[in-house]
Amino acid sequence: MNGVINIYKNTGMTSFDVVAMVRRVAKMKKVGHTGTLDPEASGVLPVCLGKATKIIDYIMENKKVYRVNLKLGMVTDTYDLEGEVLREEDASHITKDEILNCINSFVGTIDQVPPMYSALKQNGVRLYELARQGIEVHREARKITIYSIENIKIESNDNIQMDVCCSKGTYIRSLCYDIGEKLNVGATMTALERIQNGPFIKEEAINIEDLTEELLEKHIISIEKALDSFEKITVNEKFGKLLRNGVKVFDNRMYSEEVEFNKLYRVYEDNGVFLGLGKRDEKGFKLEKLLIEE
């Protein structure tokens, strides 16, 4: 079985727990998830089976959409409710307009400092392991992109909900913390749900608790379909043979569409055969990942 299954992870389980459950149902070992969701978070977690594990890195590049709840006036060491409360402040004077303006100021490409409680490594040691020892180290800010923040609901300063569309590597906990710091009252994430990962959406996900062999076979998505977020180009079959053999082709007759430099495309032969993912540079076009079904 080769393909991707759109799984909905419940709170209270790790992403590896989900993989283990899919392995049991599929009766196969070659299974991997496409981006960790913290145990206290829920939501869309595409899981790759068989040859589809080759495309895990590409699915991880997808834009993600998170539904997040945050509370103003409280800061914890983990930036969420799992941690120890470090400080509390009165946030009742903050107006809705101030909150909206602050939230919207984070849209765009920004520098974000990852939280101490994260799986990132420093000198070979995971940051959360240092944090548990009471050690805080300097973390370099990283460029991330917040594409949009929509559906902002301010029920009270204790409960703000919003949908955040962001790039790979974004820490929503850090976004909540940074919003609180900018408002000078602190903030903590209180709930997190991933509602979309590229073409994989919550409405089409199968709850991991409901997964059966029959459901898996019915809903598994082909490798080709799972890469729908990449633009498609078609090449002549003659050039397709060269690409299959790992040749970098420098010939503009190869494709009819306008092909940008350094952009990944889904590559098809003109007979409809899906070859894989390829990229063009100054020296020609080459398949980066051969994915043809043998």
UniProtKB/Swiss-Prot annotation:
Pfam families in the record: TruB_C_2 (PF16198), TruB_N (PF01509)
Keyword tRNA processing: yes
Catalytic activity as recorded in UniProt: uridine(55) in tRNA = pseudouridine(55) in tRNA
GO molecular function terms noted in the UniProt entry: RNA binding; tRNA pseudouridine(55) synthase activity
InterPro entries reported for this sequence: PsdUridine_synth_cat_dom_sf, PsdUridine_synth_N, tRNA_psdUridine_synth_TruB, TruB_C
Xref: CDD domains: PseudoU_synth_EcTruB
Entry EC no(s): 5.4.99.25
Keyword Glycosyltransferase belongs to the record: no
GO biological process: mRNA pseudouridine synthesis; tRNA pseudouridine synthesis
Cited SUPFAM superfamilies: Pseudouridine synthase
Keywords: Isomerase, tRNA processing
Family, per entry: Belongs to the pseudouridine synthase TruB family. Type 1 subfamily.
Functional summary from the UniProt entry: Responsible for synthesis of pseudouridine from uracil-55 in the psi GC loop of transfer RNAs.
PANTHER family: PSEUDOURIDYLATE SYNTHASE TRUB1, TRNA-PSEUDOURIDINE SYNTHASE
Protein name per Swiss-Prot or TrEMBL: tRNA pseudouridine synthase B
